[in-house]
Amino acid sequence: MTITTLTLGMILAAYLAGSISSAVLVCRLRGLPDPRTAGSGNPGATNVLRIGGASSAAMVLFFDMLKGALPAYIAFRLGIDQVALGAIAIAACLGHIFPIFFKFKGGKGVATAFGAMAPIGHELALALMVTWIVMVLISRYSSLAAITTAMLAPIYTWFLDERFTIPVAMLSTLIVIRHRDNIHRLLKGEESKVSRKKKG
């Protein structure tokens, strides 16, 4: 990896972009409980689905993915090498996980990581989306779907565009590590399943 002023600037910009908590902002705008203290306590799309319904969750998902996609796409267009590209994508995820603007209490980084992978190609984006949806439908566990999709992402990338296998593997490793508590709960049968807010 070649460290340049441009690379360092992109890493900082990606972290700051990732630090904008879509879940907290959407919940504030829509008069919903703070996702850091309500539901599962995780400020991400799945928890917003639980406490605010599908439309709010969709907004959070879109903006969380955008936080990863924009820095990765800009870095790619600037010709930054693949390993540095992975570092920039990870910086966006770390911003989401440890946001400087929200007392370093963030989400799991799944949507942001998948957003960073999406610019690699439509085929990869579709494969990731289908894998996640199928796993959720089968298991009803968002965490298991995220872990499974993350583990398969480097394999998909190897077949579709092997140049980006290393940065995708870096992101996948971060996602799995971030879900270590979920893995323990899954093994104990204590993990919460996906649900949505019931209409009153």
UniProtKB/Swiss-Prot annotation:
Pfam families: G3P_acyltransf. It catalyses: an acyl phosphate + sn-glycerol 3-phosphate = a 1-acyl-sn-glycero-3-phosphate + phosphate. GO terms for cellular component: plasma membrane. Keywords: Cell inner membrane, Cell membrane, Lipid biosynthesis, Lipid metabolism, Membrane, Phospholipid biosynthesis, Phospholipid metabolism, Transferase, Transmembrane, Transmembrane helix. One of its GO terms (molecular function) is acyl-phosphate glycerol-3-phosphate acyltransferase activity. It comes from the Bacteria. One of its GO terms (biological process) is phospholipid biosynthetic process. The chain crosses the membrane at residues 6-26, 56-76, 82-102, 118-138, 141-161. Probably interacts with PlsX. This is Glycerol-3-phosphate acyltransferase. It comes from Shewanella sediminis (strain HAW-EB3).
